[in-house]
Structures are given as structure tokens and as C-alpha cells.
Amino acid sequence: MPSQVTSDRLLAVLPEDLRPLAAQRLTTAEPVLRRLLAGLYGERADFDAWLGDLMESLGKLYAERPPELRALDIQRAAQPAWFLNQRMLGYCAYVQNFGGSLNGVADRIPYLEELGISYLHLLPFLRPREGENDGGFAVTSFDEVDPALGTNADLHELTTRLRTAGISLCSDFILNHVADDNQWALAAKAGDPKARAMFHVFPDRDMPDRHERTLGQVFPQVAPGNFTYVEAMGGWVWTTFYPYQWDMNWSNPDVFAAMAAAMLRLANRGIEVFRLDSTAFLWKREGTNSMNQPEAHQLLQALRAIVDIVAPGVLLKAEAIVPTRELPAYLGSTAAPECHIAYHSSLMAAGWVALAEQNTGVLREVIRNTPPLPSAATWLSYLRCHDDIG
């Protein structure tokens, strides 16, 4: 049974007509969410108060969800395997290269319909960092469209037209890091202690050097190391990717609450699938490579529980470029669901090897060694993406 106190905090902010269905969802998902979050943050003295505040926030986002999206939630919750249809066909593009703007993409919907597309992944279109921004993967604001590509109103129009055409829009949700000009980073630079605690900041090289002994490097040639000295912070900030991308401190429950809310606000704008970027890096632990830690899976399962409560029509897609044997963990299990979809990166790479060498040996070996998946989860088998073939 759900905790009455936390459930009541969510239900209290809902209109009367939305409460019965919300209460039904809470019966299943709230105990799961509480258990996962207690495992991550339960040792904090303020855990119960924090959890109550989180549930109230979720209730407000539930209430703000547009009626047409709530109807989609009901439809898909009644058919939880809707996305396992063998006719699901995806298309991936940069907005600027496919229509030039969100409005331009909307004008190309008839073309997508001709192709039989049911899933459109548009690479980052939220407001990015000024200057270098890793192709949009250094996000300044989760609540604003990149002005070069359109407006929030344009995004709403696009998602509405896509939904009418039976096409689900997928957006990247970069949850490992934000740009160094994101509002949280700016507040941290200005001396706000709560904002500073949202990042991994070290006063000297002692802890960074200890971590570096076991960490890999993502871009050793152009961005060596995993820590960047930031004068305004008076310390070293964890930057797994580029120096201007600050890793979020997911051991801080305020980060979980802020990122969950940001994701749900985007869901309420009509995003139906989230590509969760760099999921393997979410949790840091000294003495390891800080990848694939158990807590990273707890975080993803908690986000899944939140989606199941507020927006069950939404899918979560794991981007975890790890060995094939480690990938199923990001889909969870029937008893403990995590993401709905995961990239099968090894299959993609093996496909190109087969094409280049005119030999299917590697491809057949990858298929043979691909582990089974939970019943309500699937691979995203893809031909190419914006990253290298690996």
C-alpha cells in the first residue's frame, strides 16, 4: 500500500476528477518509488519532508498535464506493449538539417507519413550554451527551445501535429550534466550553497586525483581529465565530458527533484519519448570507473516510477554505450522495470562491419550473445546515430 502521507500530498493538489485514477496509479507505483528513494536518500534526517515535497510537486505537474496527453496516458496504460509493435519505425535528425526549424519539421510531417515513420527523434533542440555546446548537449535551459530553432509555442504545435499523425516525438534529456551557464551553475558561481551542492566541487586536487586513478576519459585528446578548475567556484568541478559540462551530483536529492520536474515539464509539452543521455555516468564512487553503479539503476527505476504515476504514456530510452552483456540492466526486469528501450549499439556497429567486410560473422556473433529482455522492454535497433560507430 502507498504511504498515506506522501500520497495525500500528491492527491491534495489535484482537481477532484483526477484523484481516482491518480490514487489507482499510486497504489502500484508509490511504494516502489518510496523504496528506491529511501535506498538513495533515506539516511537524511529530512527525507520524509523532502519526499512529501516531491510528491506535491509531482501532483502539480500531474494537474498541469493537458487533457489530450492524459487521454493518451490512459490509452497507452491500457496497452502497455504498444511500443513493441513490429511496425514501429524511427527517424532521427538534427532540426537545423531537417526543415531548418521546428516549424520546418512540422511541414515535413507528410514526408514522414509517406515513409511510415511512427517515432521521430530530434537531436537537442533546447536552449544550449552560448558558444561551444557539444552539438546542443550542453543545456542552458530545459524549459526553453533554442531560439535559433523556434519557440515553445512552435514545439507545442509540432508535438500536436505529430501526435495527430501517429508519430511520437523523442527528445534528448541530458541528465548527467548541464552547461556552465545553466541557472544552477550560475547560482553556484554566485555563491549559492544549495546550488553549489548540486555539483561535485572539490577545494583541491586531493579527491580528483584519487578518482582519476580509476576513471576513464571520454575525450582524452580534446578534453583530457575529468575535472576542471573553475575560478568562480574556488575549486575543481567534475566534468566527465567537456569543461563546460558540469556533472550533476545525483547523491543530492535536490538534483533528483529538479531533474524529474524538468523532464515532466517537457513531457507536458508533448514529448513522448526521452533519450536519457549518458545514463551510465550518473553515480560517482571512488575506487571505480564511476560507471554502471547500482545507484544509477535505482535512479532510473525511480524516474520510471514517477513517469508511471504522472505520464504513463511516456517512454524512457537508455543511452548507455556499454558492453552488450551490461545493457539489459538498463531495462530492469519485469518485477523492477527501468527504461522501456535501450540502444543496441553493438548490433549497429556489427552491421557496419558486415557491410564493410561483406561478412556477417561478427553480426551473427553479436546476435547470438544478446541476452533476453524483460517482457515489456525492447531494443532500439538502429542503423546510425550522431555518435561515432565505436
Residue ranges and their predicted role:
Residues 1-251, 256-257, 264, 268, ...:
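Acidic/aromatic-lined carbohydrate-recognition and catalytic surfaces
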Residues 343, 359-362:
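Catalytic-core regions of glycoside hydrolase
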Residues 366-390:
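Active-site-proximal substrate-binding groove within the catalytic cores of carbohydrate-active enzymes
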Residues 254-274, 363-367, 371-373:
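An active-site-proximal structural segment forming one wall of the substrate-binding cleft
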Residues 168, 273, 381-384:
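Residue-level signal for helical boundary/lining positions with a hydrophobic bias
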Residues 79-80, 262, 305, 368-370, ...:
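Generic recognition of flexible, low-complexity loop/linker segments
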